[in-house]
Amino acid sequence: RNPVSIGFHPASRTLWTTCQERDGLGDDLVPDFFTSLKRGAFYGWPYAYIGPNEEPRNKGQRPDLVAKTTVPDVILGAHVAVMDFTFYTGKQFPARYRNGAFLVQRG
């Protein structure tokens, strides 16, 4: 619903974003996410979330879009509020961290 930060992966050059999802469905819904952006993909707003999970406040309005909603690459907790991210390209940490992402959460 609300992409907050966006950047290119240093090795693959794919475009990635963090997303703060919608409110109003309880403390445990809807999970925020971190994902690569795919050309032509639909990520759900406002009809679905995290794949074909129909948004109850818009039930039955667009079953065609609900059915084709893309599941994000990394599902985070609800309301974690990732504010930024960076892909690590340094050599200070072990090699397994290289090209991985560090996510910055609010609070």
Identify the function of each model-found stretch.
Residues 2-107:
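Beta-propeller domain segments
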